[in-house]
Amino acid sequence: SVIEGNDSKFHMFYTAQNNYNPKYHRNGRPLQYVAHAISEDLIHWEKLPELTFGADESIYEPFDWRDPFVFYNEEEECFDMLLAARLQGASEKNGGCVGLCRSYDLIHWKAMQPFYNPKSYMTHECPDLFKMGDKWYLIYSTFSEKFVTHYRMADKISGPWTAPIEDTFDARAFYAAKTAQAKDVRMAFAWVPTKRGDSDFGQYEWGGNLIAHEIKQDKDGKLKVKPSNGLTNIFEKEITANNIEDIEIKNNEGEKVYVIEGMKETCLIEATIEFCEGSRAFGIGLKQDKDFANGYYLRFEPFYNRIVADMWPRRISGVNQWYVDGDKPFMVELERPFDYKALEENKVNIKVFVEGSIICLYVNDTVALTMR
């Protein structure tokens, strides 16, 4: 986190952790600290190790004290620092909170009671705070219930904070989001995690490639996401499939496909899909084999009010025919709620951005689902 102080210098606050020096461990676990550096030009930085500080252990645990976010609190006329923290003596599963420290000079910091403490998660990583319109928004990411970035909203910076029914921007493949605003556009920047061994069947790794969603505010204050105009405008050469015919499936049973060949490694796919009442599922398949069986799927499921990402095969073949992970009807945590009944017509407008192994779907410029 970087902020300009009253001394006309830029102050950077960042996490310090030493995994190898026992001096900075306790009971075999590394301690975490907030470190401080200053600059006059945002290029050359001077570290101030004497200002490094850890958690106030009368309130917080010393092992989770990271991701500082510093801002000027106009209501309190001071600088506040939000942190990913855990309450002292709390349960492992639900002890996480958004910690708070306060300063009047960016040098001396006092630990305060948590800024936000719902007693729901192991920790609240990468806290972020901003105001849009007349609402305040708190952003944080969790990995105990599931890997996802949440948001909360309030009328005042001091809360109370409320959770909308749909409180996320994306799914598993959009983590640790932080936001920034230029003019009237606010973006949420996160990572699409890589997979171990660059394999579909590998576990997600910690870190990956940058991805960004533009944040929009509804009239009721809830947040939606869309692709940025800058990203969409990159794709200048339009290739329209010729002789597209209506595709009809009677009795809502069976499968029928329309094939568009020649998909590029980097491309944007745009389409409007109209579906009938009672449709069980429809969608788009990417990077399919000649039998239209193996590949990746973005599937709309009106009956379940969701959009999911799937792939086939779902696992490396096993000894028995039924070793196909049929009990996982889509890729774990790659599911987005979607209210089909709220559509004025039974139509969805989709944009699918593809770059190498990354696929990002936007629906009606309100919902995003990213996969690798």
Describe the residue ranges of each PLM region.
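Beta-rich carbohydrate-recognition and catalytic domains
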Residues: 1-67, 72-126, 131-171, 192-245, ...
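Short, surface-exposed beta-strand/loop micro-motifs that present aromatic residues
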Residues: 70, 176-178
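Beta-rich accessory regions
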Residues: 156, 163, 172, 181-189, ...
